[in-house]
């Protein structure tokens, strides 16, 4: 399985392989991974990133601006084995009022062969002090041409003093690994924070059931991780503890926030204020059913990109002055269907039902 990871293109674009367009227009703001295996031929292939100019794309992304980055920074092609990990969802959550937590690890495994295939899937979990607290490995049979979800739910004892917060940004280390025929085939290292978020009827975001005091700052990452880290540290020194980007950020931004101890309200790359008050069908892009799929793609991409980061305390459907309508209703329903306890925020809801706080 061969994938193209793309970001920092600098414009909306489409992907062509060997002269054939394989994607619809993709927005410039959301880093994206595209499966390209079905379009590759034996021998040499040509991949083209072609800039497109579609009026509807601009209408959804008004007032969004990217920092200046070298074009195609962090763009690459990577390959995965035909039997292996497609994605994962990980949480380390408290168990009632007890002094321990429970890891919830969902691993999505793909088998693209036409035959059932066997593998061994396991993980190691280390606490922030480097102590091995749990490990397991099991054998599974994955049906031909299918995707299976394998769930682990072990307890993690003596976890309370490792509760993640802005003042105590302690991170566990987990390693997912795949073996076939006794040989290690895949390693996936990840950082996990022990935290549980929610919200109450007062519109407050909760951490371990208690309201968070948030000093928010609108912020998008700089062109590189080093500069961004310096800027975040400076903001923390001024008392800022919550960053509100305008669109999905590079992976390293969320990892920095996990490590530095700063909360993030992530946001889909949706902003259309100029027609926000026009609630006729098609008046605002948010109420144009023809754009529903593009809205859902952007919101889903935002969630999938950030879901495993402990610094994420809420998800925003779009800019505060973006109009409401059919597409925003569907976007809210889509995010709700994922079962995440973190609140969904849409300031443009203006009293309607498609926002949690």
Predicted features along the sequence, with ranges:
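Contiguous beta-strand segments within globular domains
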Residues: 94-108
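Substrate-binding/catalytic cleft of secreted carbohydrate-active enzymes
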Residues: 227, 242-357
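Extended acidic/polar, glycine-enriched regions
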Residues: 39-44, 106-200
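N-terminal carbohydrate-binding accessory modules
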Residues: 86, 174-236, 255
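Aromatic- and glycine-enriched glycan-recognition loops and surfaces
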Residues: 158, 167-170, 223-251
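Accessory beta-strand-rich segments of carbohydrate-active enzymes
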Residues: 1-86, 112-113, 128, 132, ...
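Low-complexity, acidic Ser/Thr/Pro/Gly-rich terminal tails and inter-domain linkers that flank the onset
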Residues: 81-97
